[in-house]
Structure formats: structure tokens, C-alpha cells
A protein has these predicted regions:
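N-terminal amphipathic alpha-helix/helix-capping segment at the start of soluble metabolic enzymes
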Residues: 2-36, 74
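Alpha/beta enzyme core
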Residues: 20-24, 38-60, 72-82, 94-118
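Active-site mouth loops of central-metabolism enzymes
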Residues: 29-42, 64, 88-97
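Acidic-and-aromatic substrate-binding clefts and catalytic sites of carbohydrate-active enzymes
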Residues: 65-69
Length: 118
């Protein structure tokens, strides 16, 4: 990121935790900020921004994500699965059937990875 933008974000994000843990079903989230993984220039920038945001819940577009990018990297190489609860999203789906199928695939992937978002 340019000109120390991440550092400014970190400074703004590091405030005293004044809200109780958010409970949604069996999930407990310290942050109310849910951040997506799309639209970043690189995986390194994404990881830096996620860290700076203080989020503990990250969405991943299952249908749009490539297995490997041109550099041979996978998005999962840059996400700390122990730190973040991953939520598969259905961006890019054009029908309800497609969205349900992609959501189920996402759940299976997270279950196989041992991520609590499954």
C-alpha cells in the first residue's frame, strides 16, 4: 500500500474493545467488520488490509476465485485459517440453484480445511 496507508488504518482500527463479542448462531466474532477478499491488486495487499482492519471474519467468492493465479499462488496461501472465520459467498452466481450449489461447495472446502466458517 502506498504512503503508509496500512499503518494509518491500523492506528484507526486499534481502539479499545468496547463492544461485547458478537454471537451469530455458534459463531463468536470480536469484530463487527466483515471484509471481502476481492478487488485487491495482489494477495499481499489483501493480507495487509485484512490485518490492518482488525476483522476476524472474511468472505471469499467461491465461484470467482481461481485455483491458482498467474504466479502460482492460491488465496488460501495468504489467509490465516486459524485467525479468520471464512465465509463463502455466492458472488457471480446467476440462479438460486447455482448459488446453493456454490454455497455447499464452499462449506465442504472450509470443512476439509478445518475452518470454523464451515
Amino acid at each position: 500500500m502506498q504512503n503508509g496507508m496500512a499503518e494509518r488504518i491500523v492506528d484507526n482500527a486499534r481502539t479499545e474493545q468496547s463492544q461485547p463479542v458478537l454471537k451469530v448462531g455458534s459463531f463468536e466474532l470480536a469484530s463487527r467488520l466483515v471484509v471481502g477478499t476481492g478487488k485487491y491488486a495482489s494477495y499481499a495487499e489483501m493480507a495487509e488490509c485484512l490485518d490492518a482492519s482488525g476483522t476476524d471474519c472474511v468472505t471469499v467468492a467461491v465461484r470467482r476465485e481461481r485455483l491458482l493465479n498467474t504466479a502460482g499462488e492460491n488465496i488460501l496461501d495468504h489467509l490465516d485459517l486459524a485467525r479468520y472465520t471464512l465465509l463463502p459467498n455466492t458472488a457471480g452466481c446467476f440462479s438460486a440453484d447455482d448459488a446453493v450449489r456454490v454455497a455447499r461447495l464452499g462449506r465442504e472446502l472450509l470443512r476439509d480445511l478445518g475452518n470454523k466458517g464451515s
